[in-house]
Amino acid sequence: MKISTKGRYALRMMLDLATHQGDGYVALKDIAQRQEISKKYLEQIVPTLGKSNILRTTRGYQGGYRLARAPQDYTVGEILRLTEGGLAPVACLDQHPIPCPRCGECATLPMWEGLERVICNYLDGITLQDLLEQQTARAANDYVI
């Protein structure tokens, strides 16, 4: 499994919104500038996040985006599942309507299922709040006189 650029950028966008949650609605151009991501690329990610009601949006002069919930209520796993379509390490574990024809006899299937559980448990155990705290700690450690 390889996390796509879309997934990584969505996570950076959500973390940026968490960082600036006290600023009200945040313009996409500001997120793009701070994160050094193309605004056009972020415009492709926003509909995916918006449809899932994890963002609040408003239009107009003071328009922009903000988190719909508190940062501790979002997991990295949730965000990546929305943008990646799943976290399965192999195609046969993806949520396809047609199961793998070798499913009943595959000796490696239990291993892949175990890996998927480990990945999901790990990513579901990290919240945006956790990432915010790590970011703050890193910034404090980077302080130079």
Labelled PLM ranges:
Residues V26-Q35:
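A short alpha-helical element within helix-turn-helix/winged-helix DNA-binding domains
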Residues A10-G22:
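Short amphipathic alpha-helical interface segments
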